[in-house]
């Protein structure tokens, strides 16, 4: 027998009261995005669960695509059959025969929402259990912790059988908590910050600053590859490339070296905030970790934050570097992040950056620039690309094609 669908159990959605269907519909849309490469698959949702109808698609590939999606508590591949006793007996015998090995223990666990069905749950357990013994005389029944629990559910439209419970990613459906702008460099920390925000239902748009010719096409490709990794958790992500060369050259020529990083980060924050307002997001997200680098001391954060009143979420702020690396490895972004392409935060990095910048000094140096004009030109020059969770191609080949 082939699985007919994957039954998705909702996670924290069950606690969301009147907003429950909004959350469920968001999860459905995210699942459709994640499975966009499987044209034959269809998705439908009810208040209790979401049904991913395979229609011939490979069940294992679909399950692997669904496992990282936030908002899913668990998955069960399911056989859908006609709800008649003879059909159920034949299906149960076939399933258990395919699973059987010497010493295997099992139990049948039936329930019915269709109370017009000819057998109640207890009688159905006995009837189907007897059918298993008829097909497999040496198999053993065990009510507590059996090797296989074959679940049989009688619903109005059909009967459903399953024996696998696969843990989902939990969390909230991406987008259920609103939208935020993720300041995505090419490093280890910002993709992890994006992942943790996605887990709590925040839809992210990735803002990446590019400074050609100082930053290479490889650095841009790396940022897009990191973004694609993040699409596995909730579907498509808008990637926003910001032209930053003019601003970095201005800062390099007009400001003291020790203040380069502080001024650079202030411009980045202004630009991200302007894009946030334009694209109707609620917060800014970054990968700052307290004390990790010069721009991430409390004094530096205060001087940089002064340019905006927008809330800034820092999901990794209290984590050690090794904790962040562990998550990066789990979500498969680490190997991309350590590719040796410099981003615009490192190309002009001073040897001795100011770790305790005074706001009065920062504002005095900033008065040398046409701040509003620089920000407006950067925002006007953004390029937006939709990154999708399609089946991945070789990134090296893609990069070579772009260079040619």
From Swiss-Prot:
It is found in: Cytoplasm. Residues 60-165 form the THUMP domain. The keyword RNA-binding applies. One of its GO terms (biological process) is tRNA 4-thiouridine biosynthesis. SMART domains: THUMP (SM00981). SUPFAM superfamilies: Adenine nucleotide alpha hydrolases-like (SSF52402), THUMP domain-like (SSF143437). GO terms for molecular function: ATP binding; CCA tRNA nucleotidyltransferase activity; tRNA binding; tRNA-uracil-4 sulfurtransferase activity. HAMAP family: ThiI. Catalyzes the ATP-dependent transfer of a sulfur to tRNA to produce 4-thiouridine in position 8 of tRNAs, which functions as a near-UV photosensor. Also catalyzes the transfer of sulfur to the sulfur carrier protein ThiS, forming ThiS-thiocarboxylate. This is a step in the synthesis of thiazole, in the thiamine biosynthesis pathway. The sulfur is donated as persulfide by IscS. This is Probable tRNA sulfurtransferase. It comes from Streptococcus equi subsp. equi (strain 4047).
């Amino acid at each position: 027998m082939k699985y007919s669908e994957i039954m998705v159990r909702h996670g924290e959605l069950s606690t969301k009261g009147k907003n429950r269907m909004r959350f469920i519909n968001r999860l459905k849309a995210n699942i459709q995005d994640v499975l966009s490469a499987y044209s034959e698959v269809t998705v439908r949702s009810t208040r209790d669960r979401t049904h991913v109808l395979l229609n011939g698609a490979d069940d294992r590939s679909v399950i692997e695509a669904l496992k990282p999606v936030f908002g899913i508590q668990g998955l069960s591949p399911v056989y859908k059959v006609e709800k008649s006793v003879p059909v159920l007996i034949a299906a149960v015998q076939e399933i258990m025969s395919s699973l059987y090995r010497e010493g295997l223990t099992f139990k049948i666990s039936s329930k019915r929402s269709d109370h017009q069905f000819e057998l109640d749950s207890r009688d159905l357990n006995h009837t189907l259990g007897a059918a298993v013994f008829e097909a497999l005389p040496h198999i053993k029944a065990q009510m507590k912790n059996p090797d296989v629990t074959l679940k049989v559910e009688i619903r109005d439209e059909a009967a459903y059988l399953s024996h696998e419970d696969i843990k989902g990613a939990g969390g909230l459906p991406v987008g259920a908590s609103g939208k935020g702008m993720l300041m995505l460099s090419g490093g280890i920390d910002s993709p992890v910050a994006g992942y943790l925000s996605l887990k709590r239902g925040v839809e992210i748009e990735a803002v990446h600053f590019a400074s050609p010719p100082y930053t290479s096409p490889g650095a841009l490709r790396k940022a897009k590859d990191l973004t694609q990794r993040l699409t596995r958790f909730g579907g498509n992500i808008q990637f926003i490339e910001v032209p930053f060369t003019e601003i970095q050259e201005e800062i390099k020529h007009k400001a003291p070296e020790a203040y380069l990083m502080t001024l650079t980060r202030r411009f980045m924050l202004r630009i991200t905030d302007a894009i946030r307002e334009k694209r109707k997001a609620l917060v800014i997200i970054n990968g700052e970790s307290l004390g990790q680098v010069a721009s991430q001391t409390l004094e530096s954060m205060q001087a940089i934050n002064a340019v905006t009143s927008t809330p800034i979420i820092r999901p990794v702020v209290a984590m050690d570097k090794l904790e962040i690396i562990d998550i990066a490895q789990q979500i498969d972004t680490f190997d991309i992040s350590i590719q040796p392409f410099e981003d615009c935060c490192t190309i002009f990095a001073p040897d001795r950056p100011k770790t305790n910048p005074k706001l009065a000094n920062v504002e005095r140096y900033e008065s040398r620039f046409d701040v509003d004009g620089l920000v407006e030109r950067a925002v006007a020059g953004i390029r937006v690309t939709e990154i999708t969770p399609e089946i991945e191609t070789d990134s090296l080949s893609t990069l070579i094609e772009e260079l040619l």
